[in-house]
């Protein structure tokens, strides 16, 4: 199993947020801005740039389906970059594959612009997506998404304890699940639990809910009822409708 502990992010490159854009509107924009504001205050002692919200609104305008990236670098003006997204990549039905990698202490709670560690891991593992483990083997998150497992009708996901990104999609998925009567526990997971799970899925700010079909060395899973229910609920929250019918 690969271990990545030498490529620490360069704080001077700043932090960023990526949001889904649907019908000219950035999805969950307030939650993304709140997370960015918290990172800027903690890391640099700076406030959210006053132009951040207007830059997002301008960038999202006219984009039917896409992603928007807002980057803030200390000492520079914030920048926005947008791109159209293939509809098949938003709430994808095709299952993804994971491959475990060790990152002692995890990636942390900030969305660093310096993604050398993640980019290196992704390049070495493609087509699989890195599943980040702590040094003791605790599963934490994906390189671009948060981890959920389903077992016996309930969900579990790693806690936001400083080792993982407090995902916007993660928070909304938990809300959707609990509103639907699905129990969700936020706690440390084990590799044995992951291997024994009935279903595994990831959540992310652009892809929404993404089923996991396989993890190297751990097992394979089918996309089942709980994944479908959370997916449909998040689709309705973000897009106003779901494709479950």
Locate each region found by the language model:
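Helix-start/capping segments and mature chain N-termini
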Residues: 1-58, 62-67, 71-245
């Amino acid at each position: 199993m690969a271990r990545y502990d030498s490529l620490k992010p360069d704080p001077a490159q700043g932090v960023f947020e990526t949001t889904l854009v649907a019908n000219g509107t950035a999805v969950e924009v307030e939650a993304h801005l709140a997370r960015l504001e918290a990172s800027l205050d903690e890391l640099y002692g700076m406030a959210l740039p006053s132009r951040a919200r207007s830059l997002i609104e301008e960038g999202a305008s006219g984009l039917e389906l896409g992603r928007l990236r807002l980057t803030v670098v200390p000492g520079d003006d914030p920048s926005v970059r947008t791109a159209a997204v293939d509809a098949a990549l938003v709430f994808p039905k095709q299952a993804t594959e994971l491959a475990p990698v060790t990152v002692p202490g995890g990636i942390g709670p900030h969305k660093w612009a310096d993604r050398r560690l993640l980019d290196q891991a992704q390049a070495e593992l493609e087509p699989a997506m890195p599943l980040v483990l702590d040094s003791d083997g605790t599963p934490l998150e994906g390189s671009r998404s948060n981890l959920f497992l389903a077992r016996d009708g309930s969900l579990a996901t790693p806690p936001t304890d400083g080792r993982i990104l407090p995902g916007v999609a993660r928070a909304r998925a938990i809300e959707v699940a609990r509103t639907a009567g699905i129990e969700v526990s936020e706690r440390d997971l084990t590799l044995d639990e992951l291997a024994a799970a009935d279903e595994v899925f990831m959540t992310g700010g652009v892809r929404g809910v993404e089923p996991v079909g396989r993890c190297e060395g751990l097992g394979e899973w089918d996309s089942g009822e709980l994944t479908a229910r959370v997916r449909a609920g998040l689709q309705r929250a973000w897009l106003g409708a779901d494709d479950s019918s």
